[in-house]
């Protein structure tokens, strides 16, 4: 895993988030859209606001391994970028005239699940949230006319796509060490957790989705499609590692450092 490339990326990108200039126009969305949208974004804002202390602790377990040197630093910067997302979303909620949350039931469930087992499971739960966030911010980007919401969702969509690639780089190396049964079990539980979570999120944010002209069932289906695309790419990376007995850092760029497929990420959100 080319952790140094990710360290460089996160160091640069987090600064861009904190200095992002937002439009100064007053929100003109009708209350029927503005009110549920503010509450919905506040939920995602809370989810991005964690300190990542337990994730960092898990990361320390693999950081000494040869192919994960620098991973601890990369995780620290990843968490810092998540917190920069929280600050951006807080500005968006304020723009919409909403209130920030200190607790919310789905967020509490995510946090508890994330630390039940080990680093791989923690990343799996985190991945579920990020795959759904990719669909969510893609929906806002294409469906919401407010310039602040549009700009923030555009930026966060691109960042989430990078986060997914970062996690894929890590997981492909870890899963390549599993036997066939371990891989099957990992895939099955990942798919089940993601499907359940997508159903819950679609229901929890149904008022916002409908205000934007999106059927919650369609949103859920897009989330499931996002999982399928991601899993296919992850398995492709694992196969590449299986076929290579020696992988030197200078022989190839990590999968996460290719240009993000932004067109693909937004295409399935189009009306």
Regions found by a protein language model. Name each.
Residues 1-271:
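Non-heme di-metal
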